[in-house]
């Protein structure tokens, strides 16, 4: 099974869909209606869906304190840098918009799209197959993107930072 990519920011963080099967969300909207819903959608309707998706804006994270990172999240930002999370989760949307192979999965040989970390606090479960119930599990249990030893404290701080984005 696979986890779905959030539609938030989907029109500015191509490719579309977690498998990157569509070059953009503009393409995904049209092909989704045609090949999944089997509806020949007039272009003006597809444009309305595009405009709606473009209108979605991230909400401030409830992990922020008065709009700022907590001390724990600030330490987590340093952990983010230490483990080079920004090699894949970079830029204003915290994504390089590339496909990456994760583990031994062969279902999608090209890899999985790097999702934005914006509003990740509201999109559990995590990882491409939804196996991580919490952000801390992503790092502490599944060691996502981490090739070094991570302490429980570092995993907790990193989760706090990522959930603050």
What positions do the PLM features span?
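Periplasmic c-type cytochrome electron-transfer domains
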Residues: 1-165
């Amino acid at each position: 099974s696979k986890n779905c990519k959030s539609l938030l920011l989907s029109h500015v963080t191509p490719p579309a869909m977690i498998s990157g099967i569509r070059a953009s969300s503009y393409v995904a909207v049209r092909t989704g209606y045609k090949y999944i819903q089997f509806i020949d959608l007039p272009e003006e309707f597809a444009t309305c869906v595009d405009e709606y998706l473009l209108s979605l804006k991230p909400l401030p994270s409830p992990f922020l304190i008065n709009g700022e990172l907590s001390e724990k999240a600030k330490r987590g930002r340093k952990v983010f840098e230490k483990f080079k999370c920004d090699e894949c989760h970079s830029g204003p949307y915290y994504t390089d918009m590339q496909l990456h192979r994760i583990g031994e999965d062969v279902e999608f040989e090209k890899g999985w799209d790097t999702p934005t970390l914006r509003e990740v606090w509201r999109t559990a479960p995590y990882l491409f197959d939804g196996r991580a119930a919490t952000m801390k599990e992503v790092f502490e249990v599944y060691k996502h993107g981490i090739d070094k030893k991570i302490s429980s404290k570092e995993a907790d701080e990193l989760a706090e930072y990522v959930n603050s984005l």
